[in-house]
Swiss-Prot record:
It holds the Pfam family P-loop_SecA. It catalyses: ATP + H2O + cellular proteinSide 1 = ADP + phosphate + cellular proteinSide 2. HAMAP family: SecA. It comes from Chlamydia trachomatis serovar D (strain ATCC VR-885 / DSM 19411 / UW-3/Cx). This is Protein translocase subunit SecA. Keywords: ATP-binding, Cell inner membrane, Cell membrane, Cytoplasm, Membrane, Nucleotide-binding, Protein transport, Translocase, Translocation, Transport. It comes from the Bacteria. The lineage of its organism: Bacteria, Pseudomonadati, Chlamydiota, Chlamydiia, Chlamydiales. Monomer and homodimer. Part of the essential Sec protein translocation apparatus which comprises SecA, SecYEG and auxiliary proteins SecDF. Other proteins may also be involved. GO terms for cellular component: cell envelope Sec protein transport complex; cytoplasm; plasma membrane.
Length: 969
């Protein structure tokens, strides 16, 4: 029925394209009409359209004319030289109808999927121009600085011709320049540059003049699937060195390495013994039928199953798994031990290991044997695995009648510190084990210049400056024997998901979005529209070639490279990691094939390598770095030879990455071909393929070196990729649900902070904080006044110590009501505040000679005090939230929903944060002591203040230096 309706009415995509096609015709009509205008008359269209928008016309109404103007300008610029990256290029682009379709979709808030080479960069100019007519901030987000600079210089020339201003944000731009850039009508930059400026404006700036942004109206995100999906789990973080250095990584690194060594040696011994039994059968296609031999083979495979749980990448294990029948037997034991009725046998078998590694879920678990080895043989402590029961410890202290209240408090502090140290040690131990067992050099990271540099799993690019969180980076530094740096402390953080939700309007463009359309719809309310190509794609997509073993696969790849190389075709070989790219490079050198390698270790030569990758006979081995945003241009001889030949050495876990690699060839009508070579030992097949795979392998086992190719295998691959994508989507959605809680708190704090920065009269803001503190104190006093263990005298003692007021007990008891008591305390505090700061203001006025300047100085002092405490308490709160996030998952053991628990407890933490901020501010204001000095500078500068604020619990008098002309005596 649904198929019939689709055939009758068309799919939703077809209906949308049909509706937009009418607008395309209107745009083309406007373009023809504007052809008769002079250049000056066409330029005047911009202020005219702006005025019409101000007069109430909608952007939708202005769209045909605005897009027609842009198309006409592109036509007029034809043949004009434009300077791009220091070189002059002739303008040769006029939007096609399909590009106008994409531009309409972007203005309407769609993600447009346009194939490689279809001109996404030019397409974006039209919605950028239209939305810039509003005068509101319009941003084009790219994936790197080079593309931002290039697009601003190249297609930005159209916007500048029409009288709009353009700016580009690149890393290293100074703050004063950034502010000017943000004033431009259209700003180009990367997601991280826009995001970090948002964080700096809301967490680092201490005066409104230091803020650079001007809001978030409309953004187009280039390669939107990369930004909002691949990078979604990586938050933007502004951090600094932590206050304390955790020595546990240095102390435990050798012990952890020793424990991992014991595990490796034990697994190697088991594997070697198993191979002695299996060696005679590795070269045969059919296993013997003798019962005793079959039992011996089965036991050897059982032993290798155990090895797979201790060292999944063991070489003997990998070699044995090349045999389909032996592989099936190992997997049969896996099914056996995962059955519920065999659970005890499984646990008994696994208990012989020191560590159980779960490669599928990227996790591990220390066994009792491993803990015993750690304590008895390696020199660890039993306390490393046992956390303190703080409730029990505190109860014991309270029950001790020999202790005074002060002693009890000191004991509790000591126990708390001991618990913190023990948790830090246990956490460090776990991260060191993770670094050794799950993090692989040249796959997850590289070592360069005494530093650990992360490799982006999606792009293959090195991520200099980025560090693994929660101490994992320090653990890897310890593992690789490089300098162990301090753990950083987070000052401000936001995920890209929540950052881009700040924009009123959001659109995107990419070549690969349709596979993630569900996620874009559910999380961002963005719909994907596939735009037709201008020219038919001539790419030949060969069927995937499946091989039994990795060894056979590489032999086939080399043979294919040699064959294609002889024909003169340029070849791009895509690999999944630095390790694989270097391995393939060694094989090519052995076969005397000249080639270049592009990976995270030599990314500095990327532009040069890519420039030569399209020449006839070129062979380029690359990681995913060459997969996205890379334009490989062919010379004439290469086109004649058949175009670029893309060879994939494995399938990525994401179908989008495979499509990106394929998309490097056959752009804009060029010829090209793509083929993937796979083995059943590839990680994707090994961990995520269907259980039916073993049966298929046993039935379709081809001769040595011969490929298998069948639609059934293609479906298996797609199923495995969908399974991984589904799991990753669940993780991203789960992460976002937690971050949404943090996001609401972040917005509240940033709004409070901005109110302080932009307030004209900080005395009003300070008095508001005093009133809030008075209300909190009233609640506390009345709560304790009605309790059996009345501690009203203690509260009053603390109050008189912290603030210059003394409460009247009788008056409080007479009032009895929270609001009345709050008004009473508030009046006392505000009166004391007025006395203190009126005297300060009078003193400043006398010295400076200007009441207005003195008022400004006092405002600066109050603003700095308030901002400093907001920032300090927020940093502490971020740490508390991270700890809560890491611990709340354990609540599921008690049949509680961790997310609900997180929301409830984070709300309590946030209430405490607001209370602590207000109390800290008010305490500091009353504790403030100032001494005034005058600078000897002869110039008659405007009076300014230099202040240094200290923690309010350990404050020292601040010195204000008034800069001005010395008074004559």
């Amino acid at each position: 029925m649904m198929d019939f309706l689709k055939r009758f009415f068309g799919s939703s995509q077809e209906r949308i394209l049909k509706r937009f096609q009418k607008l395309v015709e209107e745009v083309n009509a406007c373009d023809e009409k504007f052809s008769s205008l002079s250049d000056d008359e066409l330029r005047k269209k911009t202020p005219q359209l702006k005025q019409r928008y101000q007069d109430g016309e909608s952007l939708d109404k202005l769209l045909p004319e605005a897009y027609g103007v842009v198309k006409n300008v592109c036509r007029r610029l034809a043949g004009t030289p434009v300077e791009v990256s220091g070189y002059h290029q002739q303008w040769d682009m006029v939007p096609y109808d399909v590009q106008i379709l994409g531009a309409i979709a972007m203005h309407k808030g769609f993600i447009t999927e346009m194939q490689t080479g279809e001109g996404k960069t030019l397409t974006a100019v039209m919605p950028l121009y239209l939305n810039a007519l509003t005068g509101k901030p319009v941003h084009l987000v790219t994936v790197n600085d080079y593309l931002a600079q290039r697009d601003c210089e190249w297609v930005g020339s159209v916007l500048r011709w029409l009288g709009l201003t353009t700016g580009v944000l690149v890393s290293g731009s100074p703050p004063e320049k950034r502010k000017a850039i943000y004033q431009c009508d259209v700003v180009y930059g990367t997601a991280s540059e826009f995001g970090f400026d948002y964080l700096r404006d809301n967490s680092i700036a201490t005066r409104k003049e230091e803020q650079v942004g001007r809001g978030f109206y409309f953004a187009i995100i280039d390669e939107i699937d990369s930004v909002l999906i691949d990078e979604a789990r990586t938050p933007l973080i502004i951090s600094g060195p932590g206050e304390k250095h955790n020595p546990v990584y240095f102390e435990l690194k050798d012990r952890v390495a020793e424990l991992v060594y014991f595990q490796r040696e034990m697994c190697n011994h088991i594997a070697i013994e198993a191979r002695k039994v299996l060696d005679p059968f590795l070269g045969t296609d059919v296993l013997p039928k003798d019962k005793k031999v079959v039992e011996a083979i089965s036991e050897a495979c059982r032993a290798l199953w155990l090895v797979s749980k201790g060292m999944p990448l063991n070489r003997v294990l990998r070699r044995v798994r090349e045999h389909p029948d032996l592989r099936a037997m190992i997997d049969k034991w896996d099914v056996f031990y995962h059955a519920e009725q065999n659970k005890e046998q499984c646990l008994e078998k696994l208990s012989s290991l020191y560590i159980v590694v779960d490669e599928h879920n990227n996790d591990f678990e220390l066994t009792d044997k491993g803990m015993l080895q750690w304590i008895e043989k390696i020199g660890g402590a039993a306390e490393d695995f046992v956390m303190m029961d703080m409730g029990h410890e505190y109860a014991l202290i309270e029950e001790d009648a020999t202790l005074s209240p002060a002693d009890k408090l000191n004991r509790k502090i000591a126990v708390s510190e001991k618990d913190t140290q023990r948790k830090a040690r246990a956490h460090g131990l776990r991260q060191l084990l993770r670094a050794h067992l799950l993090m692989e050099k040249d796959i997850d990271y590289i070592v360069r210049d005494d530093q650990i540099v992360i490799i982006d799993e999606h792009t293959g690019r090195p991520q200099s400056g980025r560090r693994f969180s929660e101490g994992l980076h320090q653990a890897i530094e310890a593992k690789e024997h490089v300098t162990i740096r301090k753990e950083s402390q987070t000052f401000a953080t936001v995920t890209l998901q929540n950052f881009f939700r700040l924009y009123e309007k959001l659109a995107g463009m990419t070549g690969t979005a349709i596979t993630e359309s569900r996620e874009f719809k559910e999380i961002y309310s963005l719909y994907v529209l596939q735009v037709p190509t201008f020219k038919p794609c001539l790419r030949i997509d060969h069927n995937d070639a499946f091989y039994m073993t990795e060894r056979e696969k590489y032999q086939a790849i080399v043979a294919e490279i040699i064959s294609a190389h002889r024909s003169g075709k340029p070849i791009l070989i895509g690999t999944e990691s630095v390790e694989v790219s270097e391995k393939l490079s060694r094989i090519l050198r052995q076969n005397r094939i000249n080639h270049t390698v592009l990976n995270a270790k030599n990314h500095a030569q990327e532009a040069e390598i890519i420039a030569g990758a399209g020449k006839v006979g070129a062979v380029t081995v690359a990681t995913n770095m060459a997969g996205r945003g890379t334009d490989i241009k062919l010379d004439e001889e290469a086109v004649a030879a058949g175009g670029l030949y893309v060879i994939g050495t494995s399938r990525h876990q994401s179908r989008r990455i495979d499509r990106q690699l394929r998309g490097r060839c056959a752009r804009l009508g060029d010829p090209g071909a793509a083929k993937f070579f796979l083995s059943f030992e590839d990680r994707l097949m090994r961990l995520f393929a269907s259980p039916k795979l073993n049966t298929l392998i046993r039935h379709f086992r081809p001769p040595e070196g011969e490929a298998m190719s069948d639609p059934m295998f293609d479906r298996l691959i797609e199923t495995a990729q969908k399974r991984v994508e589904g799991r990753n989507y669940t993780i991203r959605k789960h992460t976002l649900e937690y971050d949404d809680v943090m996001n609401k708190q972040r917005q509240t704090i940033y709004a409070f902070r901005n109110d302080v920065l932009h307030a004209e009269d900080l005395f009003v803001v300070a008095k508001e904080q005093i009133e809030h503190v008075a209300l909190a104190l009233a609640f506390l006093i009345l709560k304790d006044a009605h309790a059996d263990h009345c501690s009203l005298p203690k509260i009053e003692e603390w109050l008189s110590y912290s603030f210059p007021v003394k409460l009247d007990d009788q008056e409080i008891r007479r009032l009895g009501d929270v609001d009345a008591v709050a008004d009473y305390i508030g009046d006392l505090l505000i009166e004391a505040f007025d006395v203190k700061f009126s005297a300060m203001l009078a003193e400043f006025t006398e010295i400076i000679g200007s009441a207005a300047n003195a008022q400004g100085i006092c405002n600066d002092i109050l603003r700095s005090v308030i901002i400093s405490h907001i920032d300090e308490e927020w940093k502490v709160h971020l740490v508390d939230m991270d700890l809560l996030r890491s611990e709340v998952g354990l609540r599921s053991v008690g049949q509680k929903d961790p997310l609900i628990e997180f929301k409830n407890e984070s709300f309590l933490l946030f209430e405490g944060l607001i209370r602590d901020i207000r109390i800290a501010i008010v305490k500091h204001l009353f504790a403030l002591e100032l001494s005034l000095t005058r600078s000897d500078r002869p110039d008659n500068a405007i009076p300014t203040v230099a202040t240094a604020f200290h923690n309010h619990d350990n404050f020292r008098p601040m010195e204000l230096t008034i800069v001005g002309e010395e008074e004559e005596s």
